């Protein structure tokens, strides 16, 4: 996987502890970026959902992508979606723009990766930075 916002600072890493999250920790990574920042596909895949998605309203305007090999990702809190449901996307493709929608404390991208069965459950969350680091090495 590649970073969905290359060069942007991570403000809330995976598993940061906090009572505001259901499991007591953050289930993805947050990248600080102004509204309108280009969001890119972290890997090739197929767009499963756009807009208000089934993963929950707290994600705001979002894109859910099946990246294959048992991985799905959500790109959340977007101001703009540039892809459609069912569309095939490529690594690095501009798919949306950062925003401040849903349960958000300011403009950023929330990037979360899950493995099958893709539920909102502790055993389904994966640290995206580990996957990005694997690609880089």
Placement of each model-derived feature along the sequence:
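Acidic, glycine-rich catalytic/binding loops that coordinate metals and/or anionic ligands
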Residues: 1-2, 32, 81-93, 112-137
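A generic structural motif
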Residues: 14, 51, 79-82, 117
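Surface-exposed, glycine-biased beta-strand/turn segments
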Residues: 1-61, 91, 100, 104
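Short, basic/aromatic beta-hairpin or loop at an interaction surface
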Residues: 20, 64-74
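Short, solvent-exposed beta-edge and connector elements
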Residues: 43-44, 71-80
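Short, acidic/hydrophobic/Gly-rich beta-strand patch recurrent on exposed beta strands
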Residues: 29-32, 61-68, 110-112
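Histidine-centered catalytic micro-motifs
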Residues: 74-78, 106-114
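Short acidic/polar mixed-charge low-complexity motifs
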Residues: 37, 69-72, 122
């Amino acid at each position: 996987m590649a970073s969905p916002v290359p060069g942007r600072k991570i403000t809330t890493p995976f598993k940061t502890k906090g009572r505001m999250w259901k499991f007591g920790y953050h289930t993805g990574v947050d990248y600080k970026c102004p509204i309108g920042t280009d969001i890119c596909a972290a890997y090739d895949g197929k767009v499963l959902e756009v807009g208000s998605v089934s993963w929950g309203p707290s994600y705001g305007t979002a894109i859910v992508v099946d990246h294959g090999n048992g991985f799905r990702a959500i790109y959340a809190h977007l101001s703009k979606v540039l892809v459609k449901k069912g569309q095939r996307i490529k690594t690095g493709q501009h798919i949306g723009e950062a925003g401040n929608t849903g349960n958000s404390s300011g403009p950023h991208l929330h990037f979360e990766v899950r493995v099958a069965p893709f539920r909102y459950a502790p055993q389904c969350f994966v640290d995206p930075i580990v996957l990005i680091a694997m690609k880089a090495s």
